[in-house]
Amino acid sequence: MSVSTFNRCWSKVILETLTRHGVKHFCIAPGSRSTPLTLEANRLQEQRRALCHTHFDERGLGFFALGLAKSSQTPVAIIVTSGTAAANLYPAIIEARQTGDNLIVLTADRPDELIECGANQAILQQNMFAGYPVASVNLPRPSQDYIVSWLISTLDQACHQQAQQAGVIHINVPFAEPLYDADEDEIDVHPWLAPVQRWLNHNKPWADHQALQEEVVMHEHWDNWRTKRGVIVAGRLTQEQSMGITAWANTMGWVVLTDIQSGVEPSLPYADIWLANKTVREKLLQADLVIQLGYAFVSKRINQFLADFKGEYWIVDESAHRVDPYHHIHTRFTAKVHHWLRAHPPLRQKPWLLEPLALSKFCASFIEQQVGGNLNEASLAHHIERILPNNGILFLGNSLFVRLVDALGKLPEGYPVITNRGASGIDGLLATAAGVGMGSNQPVVAMIGDVSALYDLNSLALFKNVNQPTIIFLINNNGGAIFDMLPVESSVKSEFYRMPHHTEFSQAASMFDLKYARPYTWADLSSVLKQAYSRKEATVIEIKVGPMDGSNTYKRLIEQISYAVIGA
């Protein structure tokens, strides 16, 4: 049998193993060395056992796969060729590791004899992603010297590790040439596969790993702690885990601080603003117990509160990761939040602190007054619920706008919010949003900053084949407005931080054959959205705002609330 045919046989086993662990999507970049993997992925698609997605840029492809993994809640495989093609996946791998999203990265490689000898497109790929993957598998070149069950069990174990500790698997797969003259009829009947034909004929993983059965056990002193003064702080949570938190805490009379990523409808909205009030913040720090649900908080004021709190501290999160950057002495519950709530019944009692409610109500009217009725960055964040479809998904980019939404916005209970707040980079945000849409059957609204869009501009190509209404808001404040928050001299800030670009995006949308609109008023926007939601395609909506409008409003609100005197 030819080398190319056995390369395909080897690749068939790899991809078969991955599909048994829930892989339904293969994201593929063009390349020669990855041909055996690409053609086997295509065979799975022809058999209607998987879907293949393509993109010409590996960096964007990695983030597209990340978005797919986020919205589909399944592991997503990526196939790339050797060389810097593999290296371009690094940013998405870092983000997936930080957020616990499951990617399986298949990097084709040159065989050993072509490494470190001047051969073309041959770099050091083994373990190239350092400690970011939860499992790294460096396969040998395909050879019948290895029994097929070894290959399956090696990959099966890596997938099991991923199931236990969510994140990235890196599988480096060297192939020798030739790559193209495989006999299709010989691949499935190769004698090397004979020992595993029974396994190939069903759709189960190699090993039957029994799930660890764990019930959440009530804290032994819960009857005492639930009578104390408590604060619930809800960070990034799945939609399933977000339900019921506010009702539980309100029954207890406890204060609830919610992150925009939590999916929890806030009973005390605008916490990032009202926590700037020193008087209320100091009273809140007198709590006996803080319970952190989830992690990764956007709000600077919530993070400052957590850093300063010195009392009893509990953490509830389903991952085994460290999720307390302030290193409290704490009690840790590794559990889903709704399971934990069920195991810890609330005690009905009156609120122990009334000032946050009074200040939150004051903020509501004060923010409305400050943001005004014009269509601008702050008003868009404050009234974000106006632009969202009932059954949609909101993807929030990074930098200033996510902070404005977290500080000024309110979302309905359980409304899905997806972010890249692991490493919080501005790279790959358009690509991630495209992947989110592809992995769901729901309308998607993406809110992206102008610099983020420029950074990932070619990922607009990924929106050409969407199958549901997709709205891409580009908030154009002519540069990195987040840096207006820095105490840097204005001329230096403009040249080295904000970097104004004086660009608009109409021609970019045209280049990728996407619908485009630039509304100037809320009435304009309402009309544009009505049309956009009626089409199963992508629409780019550019909102041009003053360079410092959003940041100035944000700073002004925080400053004025910090001095407010509110009676409980």
From Swiss-Prot:
Homodimer. SUPFAM superfamilies: Thiamin diphosphate-binding fold (THDP-binding). It is an enzyme of class 2 (transferase). Keywords: Magnesium, Manganese, Menaquinone biosynthesis, Metal-binding, Thiamine pyrophosphate, Transferase. GO terms for molecular function: 2-succinyl-5-enolpyruvyl-6-hydroxy-3-cyclohexene-1-carboxylic-acid synthase activity; magnesium ion binding; manganese ion binding; thiamine pyrophosphate binding. HAMAP family: MenD. Pathway: Quinol/quinone metabolism; 1,4-dihydroxy-2-naphthoate biosynthesis; 1,4-dihydroxy-2-naphthoate from chorismate: step 2/7; Quinol/quinone metabolism; menaquinone biosynthesis. Catalyzes the thiamine diphosphate-dependent decarboxylation of 2-oxoglutarate and the subsequent addition of the resulting succinic semialdehyde-thiamine pyrophosphate anion to isochorismate to yield 2-succinyl-5-enolpyruvyl-6-hydroxy-3-cyclohexene-1-carboxylate (SEPHCHC). One of its GO terms (biological process) is menaquinone biosynthetic process. Its EC number is 2.2.1.9. This is 2-succinyl-5-enolpyruvyl-6-hydroxy-3-cyclohexene-1-carboxylate synthase. PANTHER family: 2-SUCCINYL-5-ENOLPYRUVYL-6-HYDROXY-3-CYCLOHEXENE-1-CARBOXYLATE SYNTHASE, PROTEIN PHYLLO, CHLOROPLASTIC. Its cofactor is Mg(2+); Mn(2+); thiamine diphosphate. The gene is menD. It comes from the Bacteria. Belongs to the TPP enzyme family. MenD subfamily. It holds the Pfam family TPP_enzyme_C. It catalyses: isochorismate + 2-oxoglutarate + H(+) = 5-enolpyruvoyl-6-hydroxy-2-succinyl-cyclohex-3-ene-1-carboxylate + CO2. Binds 1 thiamine pyrophosphate per subunit.
